[in-house]
Amino acid sequence: MFLEIPRWLLALIILYLSIPLVVYYVIPYLFYGNKSTKKRIIIFVLGDVGHSPRICYHAISFSKLGWQVELCGYVEDTLPKIISSDPNITVHHMSNLKRKGGGTSVIFMVKKVLFQVLSIFKLLWELRGSDYILVQNPPSIPILPIAVLYKLTGCKLIIDWHNLAYSILQLKFKGNFYHPLVLISYMVEMIFSKFADYNLTVTEAMRKYLIQSFHLNPKRCAVLYDRPASQFQPLAGDISRQKALTTKAFIKNYIRDDFDTEKGDKIIVTSTSFTPDEDIGILLGALKIYENSYVKFDSSLPKILCFITGKGPLKEKYMKQVEEYDWKRCQIEFVWLSAEDYPKLLQLCDYGVSLHTSSSGLDLPMKILDMFGSGLPVIAMNYPVLDELVQHNVNGLKFVDRRELHESLIFAMKDADLYQKLKKNVTQEAENRWQSNWERTMRDLKLIH
């Protein structure tokens, strides 16, 4: 009997009978996966999770609202305990392709992007069914196009703009905007950002740029200023700084016998990724001029202990420069600290130094907010958008070259009244913390209620 039925009719019957199977099982499996009863967000950073503080703050803030957070990125160091111990946050470790000599940098970049594409697709397939995906930009390639494609599952896209990826690449190619790789990066950011449901920026200047240059919807763009998280606090008044310096395991080995903060010796700190947009040479040059001032003009200048935290491609170069110089009044230490010890170090310092200049001229260094939260006035390299954060002689000092930095260091080291004024203003500034600022911005975007 079945043999007499036309093939087209048999196919139609099979198709008709398979509709419930497709609708109730296949489509939910493909697009929703293990859909959670909680609101669920994927947070993606193509960087080290433990040293991506703003991304970690996002994860913690969503978790506090009861959301299920899927935090994706490289885990190259110990995760902050507040992340690893949070039952609402699941960390997904991505493998990172490391360069092992041989081959040109362009070939390696292509291999790395292809490796990232496969890794991201695999991970997003496992996490399908999420309500939102938040990606950090930069980098934009390959995560931004993939995140836009992921919207087909019904997921809404949030881009957290830390900077412009093409501007960082442009810096690498000596400012050449028309280099093919720079143009590709620019087009990827401009085109795919239009598909975002929400855009968060770190400055008002960046928000205006995205609206005017990328023609993004103003209603979908909001400024979420970096603010210090709760772990960044000034040193409690009942704790002796000198005692802490000589007893805390993470720092005591750097404190020489003749160094005494109670006798006026000072500690400064800078955090850096040792990239071209942060010239550590300016700080080293200023400290050399300080040394010269001590020898030739003012023997009353206090000792300076300078901590340089972080790691990156130019670190070895600067370490060698420090080793080759005969320091008499300054001691410079390169350190790499855990997420728990870094706030403790800031508590013990007098001033923070920021050498960030911004490849785009539109972002702000988060390290300054960490320093403010710890009660540190900041001596910062000046560029136009910095006015959104640092006001000269109010909550910090500004400079444009090593000589101005040297002059700022002299004022900072010797003028106790200036220090007290700056510290008071910084303490007031730091009262506005991340969580309250985050919730206010998210409500304005109607992301939360």
From Swiss-Prot:
Function comment: Participates in the formation of the lipid-linked precursor oligosaccharide for N-glycosylation. Involved in assembling the dolichol-pyrophosphate-GlcNAc(2)-Man(5) intermediate on the cytoplasmic surface of the ER.
Protein name per Swiss-Prot or TrEMBL: Chitobiosyldiphosphodolichol beta-mannosyltransferase
Record region (Required for oligomerization): 435-449
A cellular component annotation (GO) from this entry: cytoplasmic side of endoplasmic reticulum membrane
Its EC number(s): 2.4.1.142
Cytoplasmic side: 29-104, 126-449
Membrane topology listed for this record: Single-pass membrane protein
Organism: Saccharomyces cerevisiae (strain ATCC 204508 / S288c)
Any GO BP annotation: protein glycosylation
Intramembrane segments: 105-125
Enzyme class: transferase
